[in-house]
Regions:
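A transmembrane-helix-recognition feature enriched in membrane-embedded lipid enzymes
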Residues: 109-131
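A structural signal for short, hydrophobic/glycine-enriched beta-strand patches
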Residues: 1-110
Length: 147
């Protein structure tokens, strides 16, 4: 995401993740990393209720009115993220995040298979995300999403 932003491919960054508990905050880690690498807080928007990839894609369209996006995530996770965004009518491109190799990839692959099956069922059934809420404009201040 940082490289795409620095290259001018994206003017704003929507970070999305689980922040359902005070002691568990995926958003904080992502925001701090982006800030540390020179991204202005004014372009970092946060969705604190991205409890699943499905929730993140659904909320990106329903809450933040995203119509076009570049999704950056782990390569093994990218097909599901693209599917979820496309199911919401988002014109989407995907980029596999560069990163370290971690042990346990076999277990993550199994989890990914199960998650894909679940999310296809959610798309077909019209499942709502865990939380919806009022619209948030990506043309407004990013600080409105600080949570």
């Amino acid at each position: 995401a940082l490289n795409l932003y620095q290259a001018g491919a994206a003017k704003k960054i929507l970070i999305t993740g689980d922040h359902g508990q005070i002691q568990y905050d995926e958003i904080k880690a992502m925001r701090q990393w982006l800030l540390k690498h020179g991204v202005s807080a004014q372009v970092i928007y946060a969705d604190h209720a991205g409890f699943s990839t499905y929730d993140s894609a659904y909320r990106a369209e329903a809450i933040f009115s995203v119509q076009r996006a570049i999704v950056v995530t782990q390569p093994y996770h990218l097909p599901r993220a693209l599917y979820d965004c496309q199911s919401r009518g988002i014109e989407v491109w995907g980029v596999g995040a560069a990163g370290n190799a971690y042990s346990g990839q076999t277990a993550r692959n199994l989890r990914e298979y199960l998650a894909r099956t679940k999310e296809v069922a959610w798309v077909v059934s019209g499942q709502k995300p865990t939380y919806l809420g009022p619209k948030i404009s990506l043309d407004g201040p990013a600080s409105a999403t600080d949570g």
